[in-house]
Structures are given as structure tokens and as C-alpha cells.
Amino acid sequence: MAKSKFERNKPHVNVGTIGHVDHGKTTLTAALTRVCAEVFGGTAVAFDGIDNAPEERERGITISTSHVEYDSPTRHYAHVDCPGHADYVKNMITGAAQMDGAILVCGATDGPMPQTREHILLSRQVGVPYIVVFLNKSDLLADDCGGADSEEYAEMLELVEMELRDLLSEYDFPGDDTPIIPGSALMALKGEDDNEMGTTAVRKLVETLDTYIPDPERAIDGAFLMPIEDVFSIQGRGTVVTGRVERGIIKIQEEVEIVGIVDTTKTTCTGVEMFRKLLDEGRAGENCGILLRGTKREDVQRGQVLAKPGSITPHTQFEAEVYVLGKDEGGRHTPFFKGYRPQFYFRTTDVTGACSLPEGVEMVMPGDNIQMTVELIHPIAMDEGLRFAIREGGRTVGAGVVAKILK
């Protein structure tokens, strides 16, 4: 059989399931593949195929993640599901699986639980822009209340919904406007649909993903940004900086800023080359060399970025959500305390920074995740959502994401 060609005619959207342990994230993931395969074509993936998540290494951290895909009439979804809570923490902080939107799975019989809250907080910290709620096990709640058309069931459902909306609002998500879909993932997985809680509910969830999560901005549509990896001077032509374009497009004769470490300067791109060929432009994802007019070799260094003027600014102080590697992951063997000064590796370079811990936290153990405030000794070009590694002498001991810029 010929290998099927990957159709690029639909927008590609990254989603994932989040929520408390045993509320049904993996069952829902399997149900989504089954329902979409049946209704819109594609391949169903069994529960076991998702639950045995392969281990991956991301920035030196071992994470177990399952990746599945499914289609709606208008989109192609790539979906991540993690077996354990620690895997979610690592996944979201390292950005190993960046989500354009998350499906928060909450058991209707339990209501919001500690990890429900923690995953909403993590989503806020790492910049997951949209959350849709699937209120799972609604069939069990209906059984407990004397049926899906009983008054008690309607009241209980409303209570859980209110709790969830309050929780979402607490972390600056639009709780009142968040879609909440009651249903049963297990029913949908088995192909059942009593009281429209199975297949119908999961179809409704897919329709909600289609309408509530907007098409993500593609890297190429962003404001031009290229982290500088190397600097050369070419006799008679000037200074060339090389790197991989992170987002946007750079054209010849466009003005750019050199941002980070020292004061921001302006210059003009007078040439773009790739594999020794001269081009009119450099695009997101491409490794290229950019010739800069009137810029001296010593005015530019690795760790700075080349960017569209005004699109990014340098900062030294920020709040971060950090995961500290466990001893078995090659991390530290001992805790660290406030005033800890490791290197923070942003894009292409290490910068020393001092850590302040939240009130009441004396020390941080290997394997913890923590919110901390960091003050760098040099400014770095950053946006909220930028990922970094924490290193000691070139060895990764943690991973983090900029949650809020302070200065």
C-alpha cells in the first residue's frame, strides 16, 4: 500500500488534555481519535496505545508523552497526553509540547481537585492561551442523582460548573465564557451515546475546539526575530551575523535592531545568504547569514537577537515557573536556597542570575516545580513565554519559562 501523503490543506492546531489524575484524560484522548476517525476519517488509537507513553528527552529532561492526531472537517489536530502529573509539569515548562489550547478534563463526580487547580495555574504561567472544559463521567453523576433528566443532576452539574468557572477566573482565564461540555469519555470510546453523553458529547467537544480556539499565528507571520549564533567580518563587505530565523521574514534594505546584553542599536540588512547563495529574504525556520550595514564586528555578540524595530525589548527581572531536575535526571543532588546564582541559558547564551524564592519557601529540592523571581546581570531580549534552561557549569539542572516580565 502506498504511503498516504500528509495533507497540508488544513490549519494545524496543537492541543492537549490536562487535569487531575484519573479524571479520564487518556480515555478522552482515545475517544477523540475514535469519534473523529468514524465521523471525519483518520485512525483510531486504543487506550493502551496512548497509556504506554514513550519517553522523550527535551533539553536533557526525560518526559513521557503520547502524541495522537485527529481531524475535524476544518482542521488537523495534534494532541498530547501525559501519563503522570510530573510529566505534565515538565512538558508545559520546557515547551516540549506547546499547546494552542488545552482540554481540561474534570470528573463530574469529584469536581475540581488539587491537580485541576495546578494545571490551570501552569497553563496561565506558561502561556496556554485557551482552555475548553470536558466534564467527564457525567453519566456516573446522573446515576448517582437518579437520572440525566432529574433536577438533582442539573443542580449538581451546575455546582461543579460554577466551581470550575471560579477556578478559571482566579487564574485570569475567562471563566464565565469558557465552554464546558458534560459527557462520558468511556461511553464515547465504546461507541455508546445514552442521553447524548458519549459520541455526541465528544463531537460537540471537537466542534468547540474548532470555534473557540482561533487558528494559531504561524511563525512566519510574526515580527522578525533571529537569535545571533555567530558573528564574522567579511573583508570589503562588513559584518555578517548567522542564526536560525525564529519568526517572521527579513528582506534586504529593512531596518533591524540588535537587542540584548548592551544598549539596543539600529542597523540595516544589506544582504541575506543561505548555503553561500544570495537571497532576497530570510524566512522563519531558515539558517542564514545576514549582512549588516556599518556595524562593527565587536558591536555584535552571540546571545543578542536581530529583530524588527520595536518588536522586542531587553529585560533583567522576571517571574518564572521553573522545574528543577531530579537527581536521577542528572540534576542537582542537593537543594538550593534563596540567593542561588546559576546560569540562565536563553536561546544561544548563558547569563548569570540571582533567584528569589516565594514567601515561606526556604529551599527548593531536586524534582520540585516552583515560581521564582530572577534578576539577570545582563539584559536579554525576552517576551513572556520564552523558555530557558538553568545550568551550572554547562550542565542543565532545571528548565523554566518567563511567566511575567518585571523590569
Swiss-Prot record:
Residues covered by region (G1): 19-26
Where would I find the tr-type G domain in this sequence?
10-217
Q: Which reaction does it catalyse?
A: GTP + H2O = GDP + phosphate + H(+)
Chief site of localization: cytoplasm
Annotated compartments:
Cytoplasm
Give me the residues that bind GTP, please: 19-26, 81-85, 136-139
Region ranges (G5): 184-186
Q: Tell me the InterPro entries matching this sequence.
A: EF-Tu_GTP-bd, EF-Tu_GTPase, EFTu-like_2, EFTU_2, G_TR_CS, P-loop_NTPase, Small_GTP-bd, T_Tr_GTP-bd_dom
Q: What Pfam families does the record point to?
A: GTP_EFTU, GTP_EFTU_D2, GTP_EFTU_D3
UniProt-recorded Gene Ontology molecular function terms: GTP binding; GTPase activity; guanosine tetraphosphate binding; translation elongation factor activity
Tell me the Gene3D superfamilies matching this sequence.
Answer: P-loop containing nucleotide triphosphate hydrolases (3.40.50.300), Translation factors (2.40.30.10)
Q: Which UniProt keywords apply?
A: Cytoplasm, Elongation factor, GTP-binding, Hydrolase, Magnesium, Metal-binding, Nucleotide-binding, Protein biosynthesis
- The main enzyme category here is hydrolase
Quaternary structure and partners: Monomer.
HAMAP family xrefs: EF_Tu_B
Give the family from UniProt: Belongs to the TRAFAC class translation factor GTPase superfamily. Classic translation factor GTPase family. EF-Tu/EF-1A subfamily.
Provide the function of this protein. GTP hydrolase that promotes the GTP-dependent binding of aminoacyl-tRNA to the A-site of ribosomes during protein biosynthesis.
What is this protein identified as?
Answer: Elongation factor Tu
Which species is listed as the source? Answer: Marinomonas sp. (strain MWYL1)
